[in-house]
Amino acid sequence: MSYPQDGHGFFTRALDAEDRGRLDEAETAYQQAIVLFEEEGDAEQEQAACHYNLGHLYLGMNRPGRAVTAYERALQLFRRSSGSGRHQARTHLILGSLLLEMERHREAEEHLLDALGQYLDAPHEPVDQAQCHVNLGRVYEQGARASQAVTAYNRALDFYQEAEDTAAEQAECFTALGRLHEAAGRMLESGSAYAAAARLRRAAGRPPLDEDPAEELAQDEERPADREPPGGADAARGTGLVEGEDRP
């Protein structure tokens, strides 16, 4: 296939190479697109899209350090573009999730809190907001900040209960709450939370588990399909009010 020899052409070449699993070729094409967009000027959104996609690419290549650098550069460029609040929120969420998995907890917390700030200004999918609170809960739990962790998991439940097909995710939150209440000696609340988790797991068709870490959002992130990366909300599951469990 013939591609134009400009930034958009190399961007398309990178997308096609990535779709075919030719990751090294995709990396080179994204980098060439970035150089050409920089030369064109006034193409910060396009540059941001390249760095954003490179972040996803590096995750697939198991190069998390480079993924962090790419997402951070994308975030810098999104900040210069008007109307990019959704993209900023999504990138903060990805970075927070990735840094949490890398055990860089302070940086993870900063990005997750920044994502929450963006959600106040830019409408976003409940599932993304829930995942942000889940990861904050994990940060707080690992930092022995139990009361903040309880609050974060409860906030995650608020958002998950606004979305369809989130029984498994709600179960994870209740499992975490059960664990936290148990550690604090609140056995009644702990038992109620574990029971809620078991009911939700059955509803989701999953067997009860002792402990399951929250899913790693950064690893599940889908690459944007066009030159302007959509806030991951565009690909998220549809929303709709569902009945949730009562909280202990």
Describe each PLM feature range.
Residues 3-35:
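Alpha-helical segment of the N-proximal tetratricopeptide repeat
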Residues 1, 39-42, 80-84, 121-125, ...:
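Short coil/turn linkers that connect adjacent helices within long alpha-helical scaffolds
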Residues 34-36, 75-80, 114-121, 157-162, ...:
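Amphipathic alpha-helical segments of tetratricopeptide repeats
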Residues 35-49:
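Short, charge-rich amphipathic alpha-helical segments embedded
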Residues 8-21, 45-60, 86-101, 127-142, ...:
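Conserved alpha-helical positions within TPR/SEL1-like repeat arrays
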Residues 151-154, 158, 187-205:
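TPR/TPR-like (Sel1-like) alpha-helical repeat modules
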